[in-house]
Amino acid sequence: MINFREYSNKKIAVLGLGSENEALVLWFANKGVPVHLSIYDRREASALEDKQEKISHLASGLSINWQLGRKSYQSLKGYDELWRSPGWPIFCPQIQEAIHNGVVLNSPMNLFFELCPTRNIIGVTGSKGKGTTASLIYDILKLANYPVFLGGNIGVPPFAFFD
């Protein structure tokens, strides 16, 4: 099980503010983990006003530095960890340089797998039909009276299932 004190006062860069990383930021705030976050997103501030307002309100206890726009991620130096969203290319030079310099690369899904109370997890990958396939699996298991949750990029971030 994860020890949240390990994250105390760490400098963490959140790469991409999709639904998974947004849920991750709010989850860290709800746990009261005093981290120093920099949120990077290629979109301009005007496109993220609602998310910024929501996070600033709900995660007011966190130290957050917003780095928005295409040029915002020129360097990812000085962080303890990078939390990459699935849409952020793992082989971009900035991430590779950070990894080379000892920065830990992580993702919300890694943390979800670590915290999930069961190991009975079904993952669906691929480029076409993930939502349909995952929904069918969910419906079949639900009809068979299994306790089942459906989450991921189909609408509900995995962290929504934790308190």
Pin down the residues of each PLM region.
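N-terminal leader/targeting and accessory segments in enzymes
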Residues: 1-107
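Phosphate-binding loop of NTP-binding sites
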Residues: 29, 74-77, 86-163
